């Protein structure tokens, strides 16, 4: 018994020496929660798991795993592919952003609760789609980084623009160095 307790203690010490991240996959969204920030994770009525204020219906979770991925707080990475979109969200802001997509047409709603305490959210956009768009609403400033994005909106779902940001505050747009970015709005 003493050997088992020593082994578990040693394993816990070794695990804490490496930055660990709890990854929660729901459809095309990967939420990444640094273990150092997660705290208590209430499991309610066998149907809901809450991590850092973000509620997940257990039935909606496709996969959960732990790895040593470094997580940048306040970041959302969006990668467009021909007919879909993959999203990675930092756990500290997971409860403040919601996503809806139809193929590569993506809508992001940033909660009205985002403020100076939460901080500015940075969205990195990359990938390529000949029929996609980004529509985003929010009431607090944000940053949108174009990081090798080719996006054409041929059949609008949310708006006619390749990127349409409706924000109550400043939106900082940046084009990452050494990248080519092409945006084409829908005809009309």
Please provide the spans of the model-predicted regions.
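Short acidic/polar N-terminal linker immediately downstream of export determinants
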Residues: 25-30
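Structured surface patches comprising rigid loops and adjacent beta-strands/short helices at the edges
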Residues: 32-44, 57-69
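Boundary at the C-terminal end of the N-terminal hydrophobic targeting segment
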Residues: 17-24
């Amino acid at each position: 018994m003493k050997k088992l307790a020593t082994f578990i203690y040693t394993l816990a010490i070794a695990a804490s020496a490496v930055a660990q991240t709890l990854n929660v996959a729901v459809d095309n969204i990967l939420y990444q929660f640094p273990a150092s920030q997660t705290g208590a994770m209430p499991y309610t009525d066998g149907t809901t798991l809450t991590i850092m204020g973000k509620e997940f219906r257990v039935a909606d979770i496709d996969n959960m795993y732990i790895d040593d991925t470094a997580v940048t707080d306040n970041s959302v990475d969006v990668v467009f592919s021909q007919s879909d979109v993959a999203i990675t969200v930092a756990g500290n802001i997971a409860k403040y952003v919601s996503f809806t997509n139809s193929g590569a047409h993506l809508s992001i709603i940033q909660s009205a609760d985002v403020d100076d305490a939460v901080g500015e959210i940075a969205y990195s956009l990359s990938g390529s789609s000949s029929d996609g768009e980004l529509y985003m609403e929010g009431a607090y400033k944000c940053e949108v980084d174009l990081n090798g994005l080719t996006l054409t909106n041929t059949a609008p779902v949310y708006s006619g623009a390749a990127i349409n940001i409706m924000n109550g505050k400043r939106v900082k747009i940046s084009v990452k160095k050494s990248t080519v970015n092409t945006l084409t709005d829908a005809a009309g």
